[in-house]
Amino acid sequence: MAWFKRVKPSIRPTDKRDMPEGLWWKCEECGAMLHKKQFEDHFFTCAECGHHFRISPYKYFSILFDDDKYVEFDDHLRSADPLGFVDTKKYPDRVHDTIEKSGKTEACRNAHGESGGRPLVVSAMDFGFIGGSMGSVVGEKIARAVDKSLELDAPLLVISQSGGARMMEGAFSLMQMAKTAARLTRLSERKLPFVSLMTDPTMGGISASFAMLGDINISEPKALIGFAGPRVIRDTIKRDLPEGFQRAEFLLEQGFLDRVIHRRDLKNELVTLFSMLKV
């Protein structure tokens, strides 16, 4: 039995309102809560610690091209199933399900436009599509991006974001390493710059082929870059790895990279570079 009777009602809770989806983001590195506008204003990086989130090719296009104006090309290409590959599901079913779930058509997108008033061709990979893995379509798109650069007499920027070759296509996937590397020689013959931007992650057959062949090799901060992952290497050699091993800053110290560039400075750095090269 209660001894006291509440005379006045307590504070009445207001109607619960649903928070718009995607209004807040949590930093994967430091745990800070980031408001959507703040997140976008900082080019999808953490305002507290500078962590770079993975972003889609379209967001890179918006950052790089003047007034967000560009022309996408070769988006009609789709993966075939040359091996009839099956693991937990058939390869065509996996591709179809990924397209349905993500709304993306492949792990690479090509576009051309102007950056700083100068023509530029960009081929950007997407980790959100089967880990950004390189199969026949990705290799063909990068090769066609080279052809577009030759056609427009414009420099080429390739943005890598991939776990490596696409195992479901076997040797057809590995062939893309040689194919892309060979096609890039045409840019050298025409004296057109090829800039390779490595983002997190750039691994496996990507790092072992076109990603490391740039006239200028640059990276976003703390990007994981290598062939086998650090855990695999550690378990194989049974030794601890150096601090920061396979991270962008470590590779810069070892001479594998020319610059590590924050995403907010990417466009200005590229515009300055291309103006110095007069292309």
Swiss-Prot record:
InterPro entries: AcCoA_carboxyl_beta, Acetyl_CoA_COase_Trfase_b_su, ClpP/crotonase-like_dom_sf, COA_CT_N, Znf-ACC
Gene Ontology biological process: fatty acid biosynthetic process; malonyl-CoA biosynthetic process
Highest taxon above the source species: Bacteria
Cofactor: binding comment: Binds 1 zinc ion per subunit.
Pfam family for this entry, one: Zn_ribbon_ACC
Pathway involvement of the protein, from the record: Lipid metabolism; malonyl-CoA biosynthesis; malonyl-CoA from acetyl-CoA: step 1/1
Record's subunit section: Acetyl-CoA carboxylase is a heterohexamer composed of biotin carboxyl carrier protein (AccB), biotin carboxylase (AccC) and two subunits each of ACCase subunit alpha (AccA) and ACCase subunit beta (AccD).
Source organism of this protein record: Pelodictyon phaeoclathratiforme (strain DSM 5477 / BU-1)
Gene3D superfamilies given in the database record: 2-enoyl-CoA Hydratase, Chain A, domain 1
Zinc finger feature spans (C4-type): 27-49
Classification via HAMAP family: AcetylCoA_CT_beta (MF_01395)
Chemical reaction(s) catalysed: N(6)-carboxybiotinyl-L-lysyl-[protein] + acetyl-CoA = N(6)-biotinyl-L-lysyl-[protein] + malonyl-CoA
Cofactor(s) of this protein: Zn(2+)
Subcellular location as annotated: Cytoplasm
Domain CoA carboxyltransferase N-terminal stretches: 23-279
Function: Component of the acetyl coenzyme A carboxylase (ACC) complex. Biotin carboxylase (BC) catalyzes the carboxylation of biotin on its carrier protein (BCCP) and then the CO(2) group is transferred by the transcarboxylase to acetyl-CoA to form malonyl-CoA.
Molecular-function GO term, any one: zinc ion binding
Keywords, comma-separated and alphabetical: ATP-binding, Cytoplasm, Fatty acid biosynthesis, Fatty acid metabolism, Lipid biosynthesis, Lipid metabolism, Metal-binding, Nucleotide-binding, Transferase, Zinc, Zinc-finger
Family, as annotated: Belongs to the AccD/PCCB family.
Entry annotated with the keyword Transferase: yes
GO CC terms: acetyl-CoA carboxylase complex
Residues the entry annotates as binding Zn(2+): 27, 30, 46, 49
Protein name in the entry: Acetyl-coenzyme A carboxylase carboxyl transferase subunit beta
PANTHER family xref list: ACETYL-COENZYME A CARBOXYLASE CARBOXYL TRANSFERASE SUBUNIT BETA, CHLOROPLASTIC (PTHR42995:SF5)
